[in-house]
Amino acid sequence: MASKRIPLVAGNWKMNFDHLEATYFVQKLVWLLRDAHFDFKRCEVALFPSFTSLRSVQVLVEADKLHVAYGAQSVSVTTQGAFTGDVSADMIAHLGCSYVIVGHSERRKYHPEDDANIVDQVRAVLAAGMQPILCVGESFEERRQGIELDFAVGQVRDVTRDLNEEQAAKLIVAYEPVWAIGTGMVATPQSAQDAANAIRNDLKTTFGTKVSDSVRILYGGSVTSKNAAELISQPDVDGFLIGGAALDVEELAKIARLALKSTKSRN
């Protein structure tokens, strides 16, 4: 990871933890990291609770002045009105969220979100003053065909073609090969680097070096404390979007410490 980009360790809780469990987790995570003298200025930690827990997490973080960011797992493209079950970007922003996950493979699969909808989500998140974490990645079929890099880059390009330079610079990309999510299988560090580098080069071609050098690219897919150090040692991998391991507070703290350690080795 390039030292000028602050690593981001993002824990996606998916549909786990009620609001009481969520606040307990946040408290324990901060305690574990503080005990390890964690430098939150050199490595960012963010959590993604369910909608029902966001307000509880906000109250805790603001009251105790905790150095943990948080965000939402999805967002509606509409602002208000008769859209039962939807939650707008402005509503999420008013809860103090910094980030919103957009285009996660589970959203694409179970709540069919097409490319146009994902573009609209990204624009809604940006308009509300937050940063979108755009999830991209290939299935086994694309990988079998040898088109995984083109596929991931194409997913990013489908979004960035509608953004200007200022908007693109605020984008965070999470490369999550679908075949590695929740399976225990993980991309090799070189595969993760190849994908991240291809995405960054495409951003450079479209927007220039200033934008491409500023965009953080995360890896997701069966990340654990056993493989995190080698993954984040890759020059274009700037952190993680973590699923299963993010439900274990001690494991998540270990991964965060490894991400922080990677910044020290590059200075």
Curated annotation (Swiss-Prot):
Which of UniProt's keywords are assigned here?
Cytoplasm, Gluconeogenesis, Glycolysis, Isomerase
EC annotation from Swiss-Prot or TrEMBL: 5.3.1.1
Q: List the molecular function annotations (GO) for this entry.
A: triose-phosphate isomerase activity
Main localization category: cytoplasm
Q: Which residues form the active site?
A: H104, E176
Recorded GO CC terms: cytosol
Family under the similarity heading: Belongs to the triosephosphate isomerase family.
| Subunit-structure text | Homodimer.
Which HAMAP family does the record associate with it?
A: TIM_B
> Can you say what this protein is called?
Triosephosphate isomerase
Organism from which the protein derives: Bifidobacterium longum (strain NCC 2705)
